[in-house]
């Protein structure tokens, strides 16, 4: 076979639609929580592909599942079912509140399905009913949320910077203030068909929901016959130390969306719900070509079986504390963080006023010393590493972060 021609970071600028601005280096290999670039430089991975690589890179059991299924059948289309999708559905049902699952390819698709389901259920059950004032099709979401990039989900996200250039946007979506129950109560009415919320706002700054807030939303949805949708794209599949974050709060949604870590790096999304609400979607009412394909589901089934173990989930909580302790020491030396927040291995370091707006600069500086991390807006440095990252890798990665922080501090104070 002919050898591929060399590519560089400049190739991206020449050939790829400029929706992203990737780092200057190109990663060519990964193992566990270590990545290597074209020049052979190694990096400790605290980003995890944005909360995707929950078992690190190249986990042997996940790789074996992919290879085994690749030797059988890759794709069939939705005119046929397959064994891996049925097994994965049963795994998710057994592990959660759900009774039915819809599979797709991404978090955005899962949220799109959830919002469509809510409107269809309301149409079927409340349209033109006695006492119903107006159409029951309104959706309540929250400011600074992120639910995907489709026109529907980006409109629900409540961040105009992602949606304002694509007007006219879908109507009937209202945004409340996250963690402000009075704001939500003002918006949720008998015309509301759904409330969609992240248990932790990820892109919005790694901001956990208050327990009282989610319980209040549950009560408001029950009062007004609205579906409560938990977007667990980023928080799901062990990320917070429970299989899904709703389990921390003692409140169950009507619909839950999952993606990212579900495939451990292989694209897959899922919408979980109960039989009552799933019945609103009939044959042909919704679908997606690659949803539930055997390759993705074989991988996801293995990922889920490995993560949904008490020892692993307890390990996520322990690793959270290791991060917190080390970050506190860094902050004692450099005084850059106003707050360190999050759950499990979704952690946000909020920069104080002196370093406001410098999250990207800190992440770029840390990369020079061999750490890959994330931002969650201009003021938050974010970590979402492998759930099985070792204590040694955490300590070394944070030492590299400290070097990057020191570099930025010198610029600020000079």
From Swiss-Prot:
Residues carrying N6-(pyridoxal phosphate)lysine: 260
Pfam families with a match to the protein in the record: Aminotran_3
Keyword Transferase: yes
Keywords, ordered alphabetically: Aminotransferase, Arginine metabolism, Pyridoxal phosphate, Transferase
Enzyme Commission identifier(s): 2.6.1.81
Pathway(s) of this molecule: Amino-acid degradation; L-arginine degradation via AST pathway; L-glutamate and succinate from L-arginine: step 3/5
InterPro entries: Ac/SucOrn_transaminase_bac (IPR017652), AcOrn/SuccOrn_fam (IPR004636), Aminotrans_3 (IPR005814), Aminotrans_3_PPA_site (IPR049704), Class-III_PLP-dep_AT (IPR050103), PyrdxlP-dep_Trfase (IPR015424), PyrdxlP-dep_Trfase_major (IPR015421), PyrdxlP-dep_Trfase_small (IPR015422)
Domain of life: Bacteria
Family per record: Belongs to the class-III pyridoxal-phosphate-dependent aminotransferase family. AstC subfamily.
Functional note: Catalyzes the transamination of N(2)-succinylornithine and alpha-ketoglutarate into N(2)-succinylglutamate semialdehyde and glutamate. Can also act as an acetylornithine aminotransferase.
The protein, known as: Succinylornithine transaminase
Lineage: Bacteria, Pseudomonadati, Pseudomonadota, Gammaproteobacteria, Enterobacterales
Gene: astC
């Amino acid at each position: 076979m002919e050898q591929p021609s060399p590519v560089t970071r400049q190739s991206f600028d020449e050939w790829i639609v400029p929706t992203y601005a990737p780092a200057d280096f190109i990663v060519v290999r990964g193992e566990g929580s270590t990545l290597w670039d074209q020049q052979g430089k190694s990096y400790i991975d605290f980003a995890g592909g944005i909360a995707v690589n929950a078992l690190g890179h190249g986990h042997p059991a996940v790789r074996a599942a992919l290879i085994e299924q690749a030797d059988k059948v890759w794709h069939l289309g939705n005119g046929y079912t397959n064994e891996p999708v049925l097994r994965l559905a049963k795994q998710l049902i057994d592990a959660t509140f759900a009774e039915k699952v819809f599979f797709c390819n991404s978090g955005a698709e899962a949220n799109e399905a959830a919002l469509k389901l809510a409107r269809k259920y309301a149409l079927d059950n409340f349209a033109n009913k006695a006492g119903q004032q107006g159409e029951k099709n309104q959706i309540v979401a929250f400011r600074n949320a992120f639910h995907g990039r489709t026109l529907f989900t980006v409109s629900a996200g409540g961040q105009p910077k992602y949606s304002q250039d694509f007007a006219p946007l879908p109507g009937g979506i209202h945004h409340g203030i996250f963690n402000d129950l009075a704001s939500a109560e003002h918006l949720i009415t008998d015309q509301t068909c759904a409330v969609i919320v992240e248990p932790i706002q990820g892109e919005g700054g790694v901001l956990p929901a208050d327990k009282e807030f989610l319980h209040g939303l549950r009560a408001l949805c029950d009062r007004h016959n609205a579906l409560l949708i938990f977007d667990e794209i980023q928080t799901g599949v062990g990320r917070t130390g429970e299989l899904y974050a709703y389990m921390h709060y003692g409140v169950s949604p009507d619909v839950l969306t999952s993606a990212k870590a579900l495939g451990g790096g292989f694209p897959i999304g899922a919408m979980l719900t109960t039989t009552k609400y799933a019945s609103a979607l009939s044959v042909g009412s919704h679908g997606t070509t690659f949803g539930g394909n055997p390759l993705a589901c074989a991988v996801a089934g293995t990922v889920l079986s490995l993560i949904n173990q008490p020892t692993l989930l307890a390990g996520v909580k322990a690793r959270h504390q290791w991060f917190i302790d080390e970050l506190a020491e860094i902050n004692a030396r450099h005084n850059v963080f106003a707050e360190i927040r999050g759950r499990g291995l979704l952690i946000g370091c909020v920069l104080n006023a002196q370093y406001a707006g410098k999250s990207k600069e800190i992440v770029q500086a840390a990369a020079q010393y061999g750490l890959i991390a994330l931002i969650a807006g201009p003021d938050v440095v974010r970590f979402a590493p492998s759930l099985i990252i070792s204590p040694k890798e955490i300590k070394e990665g944070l030492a590299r972060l400290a070097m990057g922080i020191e570099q930025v501090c010198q610029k600020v104070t000079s």
